[in-house]
């Protein structure tokens, strides 16, 4: 059975759930109640926080920031979620914020490519097989099918 490869220079908080055959590179940070599916790769300096679930086979590239606090003045610390589907690529310097209303979800479907420097704001929903080109930005509550 394949073993996970977790670099000793990464930071993983005790609440995280790590699937099978996961790779976490040096200086990656996993905080909160993050759940990584099987065969996930988290590259160096990626930052994953909050109530975030990342599906099997997804790759989080260097310096991506996933599950961080919503950039919305209405957000007051409610429990919110981020869900990223299977086989996605979240490229360099992408930011994916959490939602801003109690028990709401920012959702990215399966087989998506979110290219470098994209931003996905609070309460967005992205369907399956979506490609966001470099520097694309979604404001809050946007749905892309």
Regions found by a protein language model. Give the residues of each.
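Structural signal for interior beta-strand "rungs" in well-ordered beta-sheet cores
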Residues: 4-145
């Amino acid at each position: 059975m394949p073993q996970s490869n977790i670099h000793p220079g990464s930071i993983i908080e005790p609440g995280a759930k790590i699937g099978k055959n996961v790779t976490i590179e040096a200086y990656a940070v996993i905080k909160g109640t993050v759940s990584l599916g099987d065969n996930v790769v988290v590259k160096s300096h990626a930052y994953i926080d909050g109530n975030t679930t990342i599906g099997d086979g997804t790759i989080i590239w260097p310096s991506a920031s996933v599950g961080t606090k919503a950039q919305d003045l209405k957000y007051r610390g409610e429990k919110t979620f981020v869900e990223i589907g299977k086989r996605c690529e979240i490229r360099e310097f992408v930011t994916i914020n959490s939602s801003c209303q109690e028990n709401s979800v920012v959702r990215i479907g399966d087989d998506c490519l979110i290219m470098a420097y994209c931003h996905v704001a609070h309460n967005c929903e992205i369907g399956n097989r979506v490609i966001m080109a470099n520097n694309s930005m979604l404001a809050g509550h946007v749905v892309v099918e």
